[in-house]
Amino acid sequence: TTLFRSTEEELGNCINKAYDSKFDTPEIAPLVKKGNSYYLELFHGSTIAFKDMALSILPHLLTTAAKKNGVTNEIVILTATSGDTGKAAMAGFADVPGTRIIVFYPKDGVSPVQEKQMLTQKGENTAVVGIYGNFDDAQTGVKNIFNDKEMKEKLAGAGFQFSSANSINIGRLV
């Protein structure tokens, strides 16, 4: 069983949870006509970044798929960011049952506003870690954690498993 065989009701529940009061317009992504052009506004989410569109629904697709596939471990999201992804992912996963999120960012590689957004994100299951280095260093660190078999085994034994909110997760495209 996969999420792609989800019922209309399951997908509807994911959509309703994702695109609720966190968006400031009932249309979520309104199509606006200006002159002879049309624009799809993707900035109405809680972080005002287009990434809110995918990262608001990803936690609900992920937890629905996990439940359908009998996954009982808590899912620990590890994500590297150079800015927008971190805050949008943290906002999407904040207080979603069965998940935790840890965002790694270059301490001197994001804007002061982005850093403050991440550091002040509410949620009992959210954490953010500033690293010395650049985005590539943060991403390499996350990849190294994913590839550490011993760590994965220990975490699995404690009831946890890793996933990501970066674009390597197919859920970002769904």
Residue ranges and their predicted role:
Residues 38-92:
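Well-ordered mid-protein domain cores that form the structural environment of catalytic cofactors
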Residues 25, 46, 99-101, 133, ...:
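Conserved internal helical-beta-strand scaffold that buttresses enzyme catalytic cores
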Residues 6-43:
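Anion-binding (especially nucleotide phosphate/pyrophosphate-binding) glycine-rich loop
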